[in-house]
Amino acid sequence: MNIVIDVGNNYIKIGAFSGGKLQWTKTYSRLHDVLQAVQAEKPVHVFISSVRNQTDFSALETVTQVHFLNKHTRLPIDIDYETPHTLGTDRIAAAVGAATLFPGCNNLFFDLGTCLTHGFINTKAVFEGGSISPGVEMRFKALAHFTEKLPLVKAEKEPPLTGKSTSGSIMSGVLNGIQFEIEGFIEAYQNKYTPINVLLTGGNASLFEKRLKEPIFVIAELNLIGLNRILNYNV
């Protein structure tokens, strides 16, 4: 069994793979709980994509082989990016996940987490880059933090088109703004690359999956699938 770990800014998601198939996933907020869960499984390999220091996972090295996704890791895709040393491992994992699920295709993927990112990987499995902008909670918090009177608002699945209150106007601006941002990118890529798959992942993907006009694939485990593919490519 392989276990892959995707450490984000707020949560840690782990997935167990056996025979190339995803068996289960779990999400944690505390690193201690992750270490306990992995140690209990006794996997053959552990592969980690993390925004934290590698020493945080040193306890796992006593029970199994631990590998980290970094700039030295061999990848099953090519990277066409001017600053590859700054490319986030989460974006690499998502790109590999897209190419694994839809090989030989143009794939446009959006990760709706702390940040809203998009990436594009072409039919030749070349990741060409994408964009980074504030995510849902970051936009709400920025409006409350950088103004005197605007309240902190929580996301709802059905924001109004026309806000009839300050909270409603914020809801409309943030959620409709993100929707139109995503749809704008989709249209621009469709005009240049046909056909193209559109994938959504990340904790806030559920807020938008039914609101986008174009057919999309919502794949919560996209990064985990990519990490397992990279692990198998290296061991």
Swiss-Prot record:
Catalytic activity reported: (R)-pantothenate + ATP = (R)-4'-phosphopantothenate + ADP + H(+)
Binding-site positions, ATP: 6-13, 114
Catalytic residues (positions): 90
Chain positions recorded as K(+) binding sites: 111
Example GO molecular function: ATP binding
Group of enzyme by EC: transferase
Record localization: Cytoplasm
Keywords, comma-separated and alphabetical: ATP-binding, Coenzyme A biosynthesis, Cytoplasm, Kinase, Metal-binding, Nucleotide-binding, Potassium, Transferase
UniProt family annotation: Belongs to the type III pantothenate kinase family.
Classification via HAMAP family: Pantothen_kinase_3
Function: Catalyzes the phosphorylation of pantothenate (Pan), the first step in CoA biosynthesis.
Name of the protein: Type III pantothenate kinase
Gene name per UniProt: coaX
